[in-house]
Amino acid sequence: MNINIDYKSRVPIYEQIVNNIEKYVSLGILKEGEQIMSIREMAINLGINPNTVKKAYDILEQKDIIVTISTKDTYITKNTKQVIENKIEKEITEIIEKINELTKLGLTKEEIIKRIEK
């Protein structure tokens, strides 16, 4: 697993780690039950503070994407793909609701798309 970090990005590093792992799970690169790097290993690999990785892992655990069994054993949870699919569905529903609000204000779907693509 290769975590891509943009050190110049405004997105915090811990958030980039979360986004990378979520992406790899949704693409099937990381599979249910698969072990991932420990906090220390990832920190060394990325050349960052272990507390940054810990923050990312804490968020992933809260989202039920990973589980840490001991300080060295962290795994992708069994229902991770479903958790991410549910999140995607929720986000899409919110986007559709926003599009409906904009059409009620008089914008066509084409105008909305044009503005988004700017």
Listing of model-derived features with the role each one plays in the protein:
Residues 36, 68-76, 80-81:
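Short, Lys/Arg-rich nucleic-acid/phosphate-binding segment
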Residues 41, 58, 62, 81, ...:
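Residue-level detection of the helix-turn-helix DNA-binding "recognition helix"
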Residues 81-89:
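Terminal helix-turn-helix DNA-binding modules in bacterial transcription factors
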Residues 51:
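Key DNA-contact positions within bacterial/archaeal DNA-binding proteins
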Residues 35-46, 60:
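A short alpha-helical element within helix-turn-helix/winged-helix DNA-binding domains
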